[in-house]
Amino acid sequence: MRRVVSILLILSFGFVFVFPQTKQKPVSQFENVEPFSIGKGSSFSASVPRSNSDSSQTQAIPNGNISQDFSDALEFIRKNHVDGKNVNYNELTKSAIDSMLHTLDPHSNYFDADEYQDLLTDEQSEYYGIGATIANYQKGNETNTFIVATFPDSPAFRAGLRYGDKILAVNGETMADKNSSFVRDKVRGKKGSVVRLLVERAATKRQDTVDLKRNRVPQPTIPDAYIIREGIGYIDMSEGFNYTTAEELTVALSELHKQGMTSLILDLRENPGGILDQAVKVAEKFLPSGSTILSQRGRFSIDNRVWRSTNKTAETMPLAVLVNGSTASASEIVSGALQDYDRALVIGENTFGKGLVQSIIDLPYGSGLTLTTAKYYTPSGRSIQRDYSKSGLYDYFNHKVSLSEQNKTEAKTLTGRKVFGGDGITPDEIVTNSPLTNTQAKLLDPIFFFSSELANGNIQGFESYKIGGQIQYGKRIRPSDYPVTDEILKAFNNFLVQNGDWKSLSSNIEAENAFIKTRIRYNLITAAFGTVSANQVLIEEDKQMAKAVEV
């Protein structure tokens, strides 16, 4: 079965800005559209079902014997390769299909049955697990997986798992030196089933066996929304677009209006895309009825579509949109349309640049295929897809290749400003947040372990920083919440010196003073109030956010 998706955007002026359109009849996003995803990498959009028996469009596949060649080669490998008895032939076949698809473009992909199920689970905005954020940290030669945070009222929270607890085993299988994604997959399972964890408590170093019943774990796409300065609202939309995004945005806007919001910062950084129908509804919040949001053009006429807003009460307040290199696909549609209509000031770094639409094909035995079947364009006619013809997958996904200015396609916004296509969305205000230096990256491990000791009252002289009682999820933090003083910085330096593997890092304390203080406080706030509140700490040091507040 094949499926496809669509998109729309809205404007905050008293008239409609109509760009040249393709001649096909516009399609409302509310008419029989089965939403799926458009996203970065292995996310995509869905498509209207189309018959596979359209013989008028079908051509004979050249080299008809190639499939027999492949079968013969596989059999020859099985019989003759030195490791033939140990080869995973499913993986071998999967890699062959992937290579074939990636010859076409970077976003056509094959998913085996497990991967396909994970994909569908992610799109439903929920999974069955224990409700905890986990991460890998290294001390000495050992890498282990630790609890970083738990979700409100989740199985992990009710079982008393807390910041810094180490996961030693899952259902009797050791997790030492395992990647956190491997541990996550072991912890997840069928709803209502029981998973047994062996954990080492951060506070006491005691080992406990904990049985947790897996349950539905909601994954909101708007983890936070609050007044960042008087009159200025902030909405974090970093988690993509799923089936609940538009409803979440409606609730967030309503609450912020009640708190006196007169302007808004919409944060699309790190947003990988998602369900197109939801991205359309997000854009419609800010663009008026009749505004073209997106056009889609494909090989077949059925893939040619146009989406327009139907919102007659669009928001009219000043709007800033934050983007970066991980703002991809459906989130680029939102930011691109708002920019084309001069409805929002786009701030940050060039976006990812994914303008291809994938259709999903259900294959036998539970696997799935995504195939690029169309390209999408912003209201001004821009394609934001980056060139992939001269680069490999690594260079493409790591932004090693970009278009020169003279090769970008020029378009104009509603007020006549020049904008360019072919390399993502270029912000109106380019502001770059500095990436972690090598030294800062090396400091993350000891900062985590020190923070865990501090939060559990194990750092002498700083017992008052011990975090006890229930986690106060979603608290608006104040400067008085877990301030990191120079005395704590000295204690951290002693911690480095006493742990031989990190001793050499102590020479960087003075140069990295601000970074270390921010990260320790971030960890303490995470332990006390959860990750949503902790993100407020990082925002205080955010250059892009500062620019958005300024303008």
Which positions does each model-derived feature cover?
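Positively charged n-region of N-terminal signal peptides that target proteins for export
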Residues: 1-4
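Bacterial N-terminal signal peptides
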Residues: 8-16
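Cationic-aromatic interfacial patches
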Residues: 22-58
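Acidic/histidine-rich, surface-exposed loop or edge segments in extracytoplasmic proteins
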Residues: 47-58, 72-81, 231, 528-532
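Cleft-lining beta-strand/loop regions that shape enzyme active-site pockets
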Residues: 61-66, 77-89, 146-162, 168-364, ...
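Extended, small/polar residue-biased N-terminal targeting/export presequences
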Residues: 78-145, 194-224, 538-549
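Polar, glycine-rich mid-to-C-terminal structural blocks
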Residues: 330, 342, 349, 353-412
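Conserved functional hotspot residues or short segments at active or partner-binding sites
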Residues: 383-384, 388-551
